[in-house]
């Protein structure tokens, strides 16, 4: 899939903008604080109904307006789709082909994106919540039903934690009802995650071996707070551990086990990647991003859109080459932001150049 056209109204520093794109590489050049990242953020927001930079929708609204509108024309294998998101003080409205979508899971996945930004280099050593978010964003696009099950899980988790904080003593019967619901939704969330990580590991290892010239293997491990011996009995084991932890959870006023506490670990040649070099970290993250692209295509039959936000300068020529080879081979529409073309020595022919200045975007040329 690829985005043919994007229209922004009152989005950050873009008052009015209409732009059309190449189905291949699109490069946005401009000084810092001109709106390059805002532009990629808008594509990300149109895909996932959320910003990668802020949770406050009001920050997305142009300073002298009260509403935001984003519309995009998406070319999928199945045909052209029109997406629209409107933000106001009354909330947000999402539409597909002018039809309002009642559920997030009905909208997300229509336009898939993979974002590679400098912050992703913290994925290995950062907080576990970053890695859970990484899993959730990819899975939500590949399997929209996952978002529904995760939402149900989080709702019951909130109920259980609220009860634990307010109760003077344990009502075993009431807690048993919440435990059963939490274990049911949580088991399905974990099953989806495990399947995803197993599939991602195969793709990521293939890319990592290519980047390292066969010298390094990459493996991933889903680190669950629920102890289980096989995937088919997660529900029973989760339920048992919830019941076993009643007193501990009551004392701590929160739920001590479940997918909300799970993590993801990375290993290079069997060694924990926390101890890897900076170069190995870059290769690992690059391998993951390329694996996201190839896995989404394998599981959905369509390519995602790749957003590279000021990361090419973080990669040496070898890693740039590997990334762009994958983009060209997989025929992935790609958006690159940069302050200069000087360090983009490996750009292929056929790219479209845009200049970004103070919230305006001007097409430079198509290079053949």
Curated annotation (Swiss-Prot):
Annotated GO biological processes are: DNA replication; DNA synthesis involved in DNA repair; double-strand break repair; SOS response
Instruction: Identify the domain of life.
Output: Bacteria
- Stored PROSITE patterns: RECF_1, RECF_2
Q: What GO molecular-function term can you cite, just one? A: single-stranded DNA binding
Q: Which GO terms describe its cellular component?
A: cytoplasm
Localization recorded for this chain is:
Cytoplasm
Output the Gene3D superfamilies linked to this UniProt entry.
Answer: P-loop containing nucleotide triphosphate hydrolases, RecF/RecN/SMC, N-terminal domain
- Kindly indicate whether the keyword DNA repair belongs to this entry: yes
Work out whether the entry's keyword set contains DNA-binding: yes
Disulfide links within the chain: none
The residues the record assigns to binding ATP are 30-37
Function in brief: The RecF protein is involved in DNA metabolism; it is required for DNA replication and normal SOS inducibility. RecF binds preferentially to single-stranded, linear DNA. It also seems to bind ATP.
Name of the protein this chain belongs to: DNA replication and repair protein RecF
Origin organism of this chain?
Streptococcus pyogenes serotype M3 (strain ATCC BAA-595 / MGAS315)
